[in-house]
Amino acid sequence: MSFTRRRFLQTSSAVAAGAAGSQLLGIRSPFAQDTMSFTPEDGAELRLLRWSKFVQGDETLWMENTKKFTEATGVPVRVDNESWEDVRPKAAVAANVGSGPDIILGWFDDPHQYPDKLVPLTDLAEYLGGKYGGWYDAAKRYGTKDGEWIGLPLGASGARMVYRQKWVQDAGYEEFPTDYQEVLKISKKLKEQGHPMGMALGHAVGDANGWLHTILWGFGGKMVDENNEVVLDSPETVGALEYVKELYENFIPGTLSWLDPNNNKVFLAGELGATANGISVWYAAKNSDDPKLQEMAEDIYHAGMPVGPVGQPTELHLFTQAMVFGYTKYPNAAKEYLRFMWEKEQYEPWQFAATGYISHPLAAYADNKVWTEIPKSMPYRDCVKNMLWNGYSGDLGPASAATMADYIVVDMFAQAASGERSPKDAAAYAARRAERSYR
């Protein structure tokens, strides 16, 4: 069975096209079959490397589904978990040396760093897209190169403003504001009340990349244009840096060194009024045995990421996708495992158990009951649908992956916020770093 394949234009209208447009790709083919399968090789066994959990329900259901797969196929699957920051370098090593896990759940555009080291997944991806309503635009951008699927998108750990409702109301707001200037105002009020904001400015692969790219694009700045020419050193970028520098003055101390776990810990310690994060903070409080944290959970709310001067959402979320490495002895078993895990019977219960921690890349899963039965998850539903991609508005490839892996945007904001460099110098220095990858 075969399956048919399917400018920030200098103004904010490009953001509307990129983010608000968020078309579905992989529209159902008239040839798509209800279920496809890959016959595992004799004696197949698999090893999967994935990022470590922030939500227990994610890991619990992932392992239960994996056990179901083994029972159905006889293929054992070993699952190893790594800290978020370690997944990318370990995947790169595996690709370079030609040995390691059969499957790795990587970040963002990792597959574009070593596409020739991966097993093509076009048949599987087109089947899933045809069966489950189509792939969102960002998912197809991340998963494909030259029309072929090199990764299989799992979704994104979405970022929303996570805040304490009472403290926000004490600051004079009914809910967390959605305008950049109002965010700056509330940050000052929360600091005055002793409940400051705090967002990661260290090498946090999810948190720092997410909110800082959102701010950069919200001011109209970007790494490259549609021709992949570096345009980071611009007045728009400087405006974004000046804004974050002022915002940082109202942050809790220590955010320059924060990694992904830090804001969770500080928030749950009762020290933060607001941060940008996934649903994991609320999940941890709600499911804690500590009555104080359970009480805190009632006061934790989620709001969409604020919109900047461009007037459209400009979000980046921690995108993750599966890669099957070319050195595997069992490519069919690997593809069958992924097919099984992405099917509705496994994916929806897993997403529900994780309370929507991973926003789906396939449109049909917008109907998962998690979004209505767990109302505090609803703000996370459309994260992948509405997100842009790192390297916007250029192409994904080795250059975009390298600049992301080197934290060029994050370092630029951290240098400007801390005063290590002026906003203008930070933008110029970051652009020079980026040009080494894009030349």
Regions found by a protein language model. Give the residues of each.
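Short, polar/charged alpha-helical segment
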Residues: 36-37, 55-76, 409, 427
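Extracytoplasmic "Venus flytrap"/periplasmic binding protein-like
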Residues: 64-135, 144, 166-178, 266, ...
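Extracytoplasmic/periplasmic solute-binding protein
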Residues: 146-154, 159, 184-230, 236, ...
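Glycine-centered hinge/linker elements that transmit conformational signals in sensory
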Residues: 186-193, 227-256, 301
